Amino acid sequence: MTVKATDNGHKATAHADTGARDAGAAETVESQRTDTQRSDVSAQSKPSHRTALIDVGGGFRAIFGAGVMDRCQEEGITFDHCYGVSAGSANMVSFLAGQHGRNHKFYTEYAFRKEYASFDSYVKHHNFANLDYVYGTLSNHDGEYPVDYEAFAANPTGFTVIACNALDGSAKYFDKSDVHYDDFNIMKASSAVPVACEPYVIDGVPYFDGGIVDPVPVQKAIDDGYDRIVLVLTRPKDVLREQKRDIAPARILRHSYPAAAERLLNRYATYNDEVALAKEYERDGRVLILAPDDLCGL
């Protein structure tokens, strides 16, 4: 009887220990589940960053931006949205189409042709840069180096092109829906340098180069909800624009497009102010500025 009672005591103790272990394990599992749920909620509550790329263009200096985008393709870097000004908008079409090296060929080979940009082109077409040749003859589906329009259209990245309304001097923000098969007119509008080119007409409205109205559209990107922005400048970032080069063209332009002439006359201040703003955002960690150290004669 004594031995039996002792055995029962051991069994009771064993059952108690097992129950305690089970209860502890259950408590641990529940604690882990709660921690996981908290982590999930925390992860969901953290906003994901929205990224944008801005290329300010700048004539042949825009080859710098072309190099940046080729490198992005090599590294598999993509963005949620792209903003292009003037030649920068053309760079981005090739980038969004995934055509590595295409822009480089335009700047290093085609740009030396008389049909591309020359005094002869100005005499014949009233445009120093023959925009129809660049964005039509060369770029259409039957052109020498066509845009892969299907790839461009399939790319989910958003796209904004900036131009200046020649009539009232306001900024026009075209989007991807304004680009069609063999229709790259918004790039022509954004690249029509005042006086050097006639304004490019879209839907009855004449447009000039976007660089005279919103040359560094960082605030536009911020207002659109993008909080991580790569800004491609084509001048050293501490080099300011000067007004003197725009005074004579603005005087000529004033006779036909006074509002655009006023924009051109004040472009230097607009550019300098927008670069200063971009530097402030860079200090906050919202903007990364990429700029050449030297213009190399361009």
Language model feature labels by segment:
Residues A5-Q44:
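Intrinsically disordered, low-complexity terminal tails and inter-domain linkers enriched
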Residues F106-A117, L253-A269, G285-V287:
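Short, basic, helix/turn surface patches
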Residues V41, S45, S139-N140, Y271:
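N-terminal short beta-loop-beta anion/metal-coordinating cradle
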Residues S121-R241, E280-L298:
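Active-site-adjacent alpha/beta core region of enzyme catalytic domains
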Residues A66, P215-V216, V275:
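Residue-level marker for well-ordered alpha-helical positions
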Residues R228-E280:
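Helix-centered, glycine/charged polyanion-binding patches within enzymatic domains
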Residues P47-D142, D175-A189, V230-L233, K237-D246:
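Patatin-like phospholipase
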